[in-house]
């Protein structure tokens, strides 16, 4: 209680607090973040970019006070959040680090334009955690990407282009996995399983390969914007190495070094992501070897 009063003195009477929740358990949040959330008059949990375990959310609520869930529309159209923030202190709780997603950077900028004070309390994010956890050099990661669910006949191949470009430059890739089959961000989330991710990879690969073959049949074949895509597609997809990272930063954390072909046989966890290694050094090879089945 004394800590909460101390934090309250440091905070504005009104405004918006972007509070990083870390990776999935109360004890993983910073003391500063917990105190700020407890000191707020209203607490909103942003539940569409990532999710916490329900039991940990219950523990957090016991610790800091009542929490209300909000989804994509409430964050992207923040009129209600701003209305509250004009006369009270509002904490928006975000899994990981609150500025990891541009959605929340945009919210921060819009609050500033509206004359609403906005404070940020950072947290551990999947980007900062997973690179070292799997045993790869953080300096050798390229742009990250997200595997999305297919919508009808539409399949996004942009993640494959990111993978190919990073691979061509000798850089590893972190691929986050979608948790919303509808793409609306309004609820009914179903985080991608390893099997879903493998199927998404195959759909992307098929579409990109068909496009490559069509280009080669043209009288004057056109070079792709990504010079590494065609060479990347020459690989055997099923043998492409991948590291499955499940429930990172929690007591259920697991890491498995496998291949795309064997990925669907893995159970994974509540939330999963993938790391695609590119060229690896000796220490990186040893680091990855720990996670192979039977190691």
List each language-model region with its residue ranges.
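Class I S-adenosyl-L-methionine
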Residues: 2-117, 121
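Beta-strand/loop-alpha-helix module characteristic of Rossmann-like adenine-cofactor folds
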Residues: 8-19, 118, 125-295
């Amino acid at each position: 209680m004394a800590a909460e009063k101390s934090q309250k003195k440091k905070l504005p009477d009104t405004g918006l607090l972007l509070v990083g929740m870390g990776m999935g358990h109360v004890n993983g949040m910073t003391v500063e973040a917990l105190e700020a959330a407890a000191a707020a008059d209203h607490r909103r949990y942003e539940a569409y970019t990532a999710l916490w375990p329900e039991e940990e959310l219950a523990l957090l609520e016991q610790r800091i006070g009542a929490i209300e869930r909000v989804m994509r529309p409430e964050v992207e159209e923040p009129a209600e959040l701003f209305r509250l923030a004009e006369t009270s202190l509002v904490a928006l709780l975000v899994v990981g680090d609150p500025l990891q997603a541009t959605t929340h950077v945009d919210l921060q900028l819009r609050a500033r334009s509206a004359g609403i004070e906005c404070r940020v309390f950072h947290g551990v994010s999947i980007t900062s955690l997973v690179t070292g956890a799997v045993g790869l050099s953080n300096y050798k990661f390229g742009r990250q990407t997200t595997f999305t669910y297919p919508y009808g006949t539409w399949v996004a191949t942009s993640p494959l282009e990111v993978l190919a470009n990073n691979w061509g430059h000798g850089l590893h890739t972190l691929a986050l996995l979608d948790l919303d089959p509808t793409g609306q961000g309004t609820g009914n989330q179903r985080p991608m399983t390893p099997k879903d991710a493998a199927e998404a990879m195959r759909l992307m690969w098929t579409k990109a390969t068909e496009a490559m073959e069509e280009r080669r049949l043209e009288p004057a074949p056109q070079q792709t914007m990504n010079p590494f895509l065609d060479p990347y597609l020459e690989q055997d997809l099923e043998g492409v190495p991948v590291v499955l990272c499940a429930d990172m930063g929690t007591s259920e954390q697991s890491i498995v070094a496998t291949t795309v072909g064997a990925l669907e046989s893995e159970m994974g966890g509540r939330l999963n992501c993938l790391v695609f290694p590119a060229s690896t050094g000796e220490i990186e090879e040893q680091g990855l070897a720990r996670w192979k089945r039977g190691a």
